[in-house]
Amino acid sequence: MPYGKIEDIKTSGASDVTAAQDGLKEGGWKSSHRMAEIDSNRMENYRTIINEAGRQCDVDPAVIAGIISRESRAGNQLINGWGDHGKAFGLMQIDVTPPPNGGGHTPVGTWDSLEHLIQATEILVEFIERIKTKFPRWNADQHLKGALAAYNKGEKNVESYASVDAKTTGKDYSNDVVARAQWYKSNMGF
């Protein structure tokens, strides 16, 4: 995969705030792994389309699974495919809020379709390219982690690698997604 090697990325995992949403006592990568595990049965339902979206977009399927787990808990937090009070769509929660406050994306496919996963993964790839341009000295793993933060809050909010999650939801988005993706890679073979 040209966009970093998820299993090699250092991560602190979920924040205490994110972990508490699942009744977990403290944050960290163990809590991220536990949340990924909780979502694993639902995630299995999407394995085929996750793998296909990864293949078509040349993105590690484990990264896609990590985003799905964080964004929608593998669909469990969606109402008719919508989340974030109607501002985000699908398993990967693409932002439909008009710019400048949102991504302004028009959803493609149904909320749980291959078309949706390809659209959302292409958005991630676009953020990878923007982060590469913004931070040309970063390595591929750093670009991926920065792009994950940008997927959540836009590339303008990624100011340095040391503070990659400073402006993300829970101040942990990329670290949590990386840890969840690592769990899916190791335990479900994504």
Swiss-Prot record:
Under Enzyme Commission nomenclature, its number is: 3.2.1.17
What residues form the catalytic site here?
A: E71, D84
Q: Which keywords label this protein?
A: Antimicrobial, Bacteriolytic enzyme, Glycosidase, Hydrolase
Instruction: Give the record's GO CC terms.
Output: extracellular region
Which protein is depicted? Lysozyme g
**Region (Disordered), start-end ranges:** 1-31
Q: Which CDD domains is this protein grouped with? A: GEWL
Question: Its GO biological process terms?
Answer: defense response to Gram-positive bacterium; killing of cells of another organism; peptidoglycan catabolic process
- Recorded catalytic activity of this chain's protein: Hydrolysis of (1->4)-beta-linkages between N-acetylmuramic acid and N-acetyl-D-glucosamine residues in a peptidoglycan and between N-acetyl-D-glucosamine residues in chitodextrins
Q: Where is the composition biased (Basic and acidic residues)?
A: 1-10
GO molecular function per UniProt: lysozyme activity
Q: What class of enzyme is it?
A: hydrolase
What protein family is recorded? Belongs to the glycosyl hydrolase 23 family.
